[in-house]
UniProtKB/Swiss-Prot annotation:
This is Glycerol uptake facilitator protein. Residues 1-5, 61-63, 79-84, 170-177, 255-281 are cytoplasmic. The chain crosses the membrane at residues 6-34, 40-60, 85-108, 144-169, 178-194, 232-254. A motif (NPA 1) lies at residues 68-70. Induction: Expression is regulated by the HTH-type transcriptional regulator GlpR and by the cAMP-cAMP receptor protein (CRP) complex. Keywords: Cell inner membrane, Cell membrane, Membrane, Repeat, Transmembrane, Transmembrane helix, Transport. It is a multi-pass membrane protein.
Length: 281
């Protein structure tokens, strides 16, 4: 298979995997907000976590199941991921999230309309932000912009560090097929503990793609600003990227360097030609 066709298949996998996790997660929130479903924070967090686990099972063998631009960037910087694939992966992830949000909206369309009519909500007003939160994340009204950024950075750093730990066969017993479920459980635990603060985005694609859809679907600028002076979309867009870089750096320097093998070093040795190895002596 050519490199081009391989990249195409990987991008399709990232599109479908990211779309799948958004379909389950946003669908759960839509059921809560407009269909009268009774979910607590833990139940919502578990559904998001299981959605991620299912998406990983679907795509891991094709693309590695990044499903998150922050993860893709961190793996490029700290785990030898091919830099030429970074932009295509990110575009695929955002597109998958956008399309899944649109699909959920289409399936729940009548319920959204009836909910707005019943509660006299004008789409695009500040009062409609809570309903826009069906698709993407907005902060608790009691925390400010900087605090929200710090929350997203910290929880994504924890997520990234533990993803590397859970998928590193050199770090204890190999997890194999259990790794996706453990990652899903990790997301559920983070969501249950920190979700009430920012909605635990931890994923620029998960947040930005659906925000773009909400903007197009009538929520307008409030979808990006969240009704705040500083556009809130910047927090779940850049906070997770910074956090993932910090988490990957911390794992590599504090844990990974003390393990028996170094993945990047091994890969570099395997790709070095005999003449290059001789020249390096």
């Amino acid at each position: 298979m050519s490199q081009t066709s391989t990249l195409k298949g990987q991008c399709i996998a990232e599109f479908l995997g990211t779309g799948l996790l958004i379909f389950f997660g946003v669908g759960c929130v839509a059921a809560l907000k407009v269909a009268g479903a009774s979910f607590g924070q833990w139940e919502i967090s578990v559904i998001w976590g299981l959605g991620v686990a299912m998406a990983i099972y679907l795509t891991a063998g094709v693309s590695g199941a990044h499903l998150n631009p922050a993860v893709t960037i961190a793996l490029w910087l700290f785990a030898c991921f091919d830099k030429r694939k970074v932009i295509p992966f990110i575009v695929s992830q955002v597109a998958g999230a956008f399309c899944a949000a649109a699909l959920v909206y289409g399936l729940y369309y009548n319920l959204f309309f009836d909910f707005e009519q019943t509660h006299h909500i004008v789409r695009g007003s500040v009062e409609s932000v809570d309903l826009a939160g069906t698709f993407s994340t907005y902060p608790n009204p009691h925390i400010n912009f900087v605090q929200a950024f710090a929350v997203e950075m910290v929880i994504t750093a924890i997520l990234m560090g533990l993803i590397l730990a859970l998928t590193d066969d050199g770090n204890g017993v190999p997890r194999g097929p259990l790794a996706p479920l453990l990652i899903g459980l990790l997301i559920a635990v983070i969501g249950a503990s920190m979700g009430p603060l920012t909605g635990f985005a931890m994923n620029p694609a998960r947040d930005f793609g659906p925000k773009v859809f909400a903007w197009l679907a009538g929520w307008g600028n409030v979808a990006f600003t969240g009704g705040r002076d500083i556009p809130y979309f910047l927090v779940p867009l850049f906070g997770p990227i910074v956090g993932a870089i910090v988490g990957a750096f911390a794992y590599r320097k504090l844990i990974g360097r003390h393990l028996p093998c170094d993945i990047c070093v091994v890969e570099e040795k395997e790709t070095t030609t005999p003449s290059e190895q001789k020249a390096s002596l």
